């Protein structure tokens, strides 16, 4: 009972496992054959791609041909009775030659049915057969009186073997594109008249480019000269001048903060104690300065003069006045026509008062 049980269990387990292993081995062999076939097809495709003669000239289809197709073509040429003698071929009718060439094309297309041949390879082989037949017919018609050695199969075999050259460098790797600078003149017909006209046009184009570049540079220089890179605010033209007793080391304020309020007749020290007499003469000096503005900034200065007359006039002064002790001057030493925050402070205080 134990022996029969072990045999039954072994058969029940071993037979399915063995059958599965056999089936897996069969599938593996089929897969390996398929891989080999695909590798061979890839090699043929690479040979067709990296073949220079197949892309440059369409008359040389030798490198694109398979070795088995070459053997079939050689055997057909050996068995072909058309190559036996040139005189019989010359006397034959052209319609009979066309019929023979068609008969040769049909078996070549149906040969090697055991192996897979791509459609493009079949077309190439048929074209090669036609080209060979046309070349042989033309050669036999032109050379009729020569001996039959010229039309033998040895010549065709040597010529076909001469064309079978394996090249691993593609045409696209050797091409260097050349593009003309003139554009539409690249496809123009070269001639003596057009060459002279092209030279003249080229010279005129170079001169035009030079002139446009020069005009662009001049415009850029003019714009840069008109720009004001020295101050954040736009400058105002003024005819007043600085005081001579101010040293360059201690004078750090802007020119526009002093020159707009200085007098021409009697210049005073801006760092000295201000006086009431000097302050009373400020409107007259301010009017004189407004009259000396240049013609280029007349519109801007007229607007600024109207606004400046309405505003309070500020002068660089200290925070005390001997003549007017009861009034405290809260003006800053570095205040100018752009940083008039004391006026803003007064306006703010006035706005806080009840109306």
UniProtKB/Swiss-Prot annotation:
Signal peptide: none
Bias (Basic and acidic residues): 92-108, 286-298
Positions bearing Phosphothreonine: 273
Extracellular side: 1-8
Major subcellular site: membrane
Subcellular location: Cell membrane; Bud membrane
GO cellular component: cellular bud membrane
Region annotated Disordered, chain positions: 70-114, 276-298
Modified residues (Phosphoserine): 142
Parts of the chain that traverse the membrane: 9-29
Name used for this protein in its record: Suppressor of lethality of KEX2 GAS1 double null mutant protein 1
């Amino acid at each position: 009972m134990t022996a029969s049980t072990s045999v039954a269990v072994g058969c029940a387990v071993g037979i399915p496992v063995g059958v599965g292993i056999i089936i897996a081995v069969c599938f593996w062999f089929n897969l390996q054959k398929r891989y080999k076939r695909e590798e061979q097809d890839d090699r043929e495709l690479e040979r067709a791609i990296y073949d220079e003669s197949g892309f440059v000239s369409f008359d040389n289809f030798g490198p694109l041909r398979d070795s088995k197709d070459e053997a079939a073509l050689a055997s057909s040429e050996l068995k072909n009775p058309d190559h036996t003698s040139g005189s019989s071929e010359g006397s034959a009718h052209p319609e009979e030659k066309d019929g023979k060439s068609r008969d040769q094309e049909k078996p070549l297309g149906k040969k090697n049915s055991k192996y897979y041949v791509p459609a493009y390879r079949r077309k190439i082989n048929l074209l090669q057969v036609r080209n060979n037949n046309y070349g042989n017919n033309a050669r036999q018609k032109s050379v009729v009186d020569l001996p039959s050695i010229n039309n033998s199969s040895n010549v065709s075999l040597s010529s076909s073997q001469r064309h079978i050259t394996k090249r691993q460098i593609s045409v696209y790797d050797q091409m260097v594109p050349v593009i003309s600078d003139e554009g539409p003149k690249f496809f123009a017909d070269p001639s003596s008249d057009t060459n002279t006209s092209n030279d003249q046009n080229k010279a005129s184009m170079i001169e035009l480019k030079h002139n446009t570049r020069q005009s662009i540079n001049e415009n850029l220089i003019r714009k840069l000269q008109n720009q004001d890179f020295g101050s954040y605010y736009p400058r105002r033209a003024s005819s007043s001048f600085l005081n001579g007793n101010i040293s360059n080391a201690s004078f750090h304020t802007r020119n526009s903060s002093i020159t707009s309020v200085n007098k021409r007749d009697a210049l005073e020290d801006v760092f000295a104690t201000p006086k009431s007499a000097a302050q009373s003469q400020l409107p007259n000096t301010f009017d004189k300065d407004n009259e000396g503005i240049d013609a280029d900034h007349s519109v801007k200065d007229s607007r600024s003069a109207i606004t400046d007359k309405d505003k309070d006039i500020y002068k660089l002064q200290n925070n005390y006045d001997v003549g007017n002790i009861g009034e405290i001057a809260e003006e800053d030493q570095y205040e100018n026509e752009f940083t008039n925050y004391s006026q803003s402070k007064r306006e703010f205080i006035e706005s806080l008062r009840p109306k």
